[in-house]
């Protein structure tokens, strides 16, 4: 009788990183950028799957080959930087509960739905030349500076419960509505903002600077009829409502020349 040896391996069975990525967090497979992008394409952009844990060891750039994809990053770890650049139409970008240990850069792309989930970004985070139908910072945590420049949403820009440890700057940013939520904005810098309504909600800022004066000012931030505040937040020193009201008043009180 021929006996089969228990535990023997078939040398013809593939053991590629992409196939072994589905495991426990403790055994998360380390992937190169090339293997990660291949895995992303193989799963049609969706890595938010049960028991899908991955660790990318190289810098990753998502480019126009992923146009028309909906990308859900799940709970991956990016040891280096993550960027999205030059994508003509990304239907969805959801960062899930991913961790990015260096920088996050979203540049020159249309992202229909952008959600930061509960992602943790250890390096600087920037959005530059981005159009969208809706942006939600959700519960994301930013250890270093966050910046938005030439960012336009035809829908809401929600700051949610996000935390910006080192501050946030917005320059040439437009949205149907800006909803500050209960975000901790740190040192907040505003320049050239366009919006239908600005809801300050219960958000806080350790400092707020509005760049520009009455002669050079662009945007509608000085139109206080568009800014809605909560009555119980107006008297709190660090509340966004208080900081914003004082900064706007200071600009209006400046001489015209």
Where are these regions (language model features)?
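N-terminal leader/targeting and pre-domain segments
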Residues: 2, 7-257
């Amino acid at each position: 009788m021929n006996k089969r040896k228990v535990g023997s391996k078939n040398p013809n069975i593939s053991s590629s990183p992409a196939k072994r990525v589905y495991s426990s967090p403790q055994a998360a497979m380390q992937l190169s950028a090339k293997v990660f992008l291949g895995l992303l394409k193989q799963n049609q952009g969706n890595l938010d799957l049960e028991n899908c844990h991955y660790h990318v060891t190289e810098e990753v750039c998502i480019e126009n080959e992923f146009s028309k994809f909906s990308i859900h990053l799940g709970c991956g770890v990016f040891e280096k930087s993550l960027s999205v650049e030059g994508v003509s139409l990304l239907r969805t970008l959801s960062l899930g509960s991913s961790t990015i240990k260096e920088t996050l850069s979203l540049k020159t792309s249309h992202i229909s739905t952008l959600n930061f989930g509960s992602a943790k970004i250890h390096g600087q985070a920037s959005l530059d030349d981005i159009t969208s139908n809706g942006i939600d910072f959700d519960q994301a945590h930013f250890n270093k500076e966050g910046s938005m420049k030439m960012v336009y949403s035809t829908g809401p820009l929600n700051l949610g419960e996000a935390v910006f440890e080192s501050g946030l700057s917005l320059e040439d940013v437009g949205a149907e509505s800006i909803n500050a939520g209960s975000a901790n904005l740190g040192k907040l810098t505003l320049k050239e903002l366009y919006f239908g309504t600005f809801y300050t909600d219960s958000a806080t800022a350790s400092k707020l600077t509005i760049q520009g004066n009455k002669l050079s000012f662009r945007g509608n931030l000085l139109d206080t009829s568009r800014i809605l505040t909560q009555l119980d937040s107006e008297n709190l020193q660090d509340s966004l409502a208080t900081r914003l009201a004082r900064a706007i008043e200071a600009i209006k009180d400046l001489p015209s020349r």
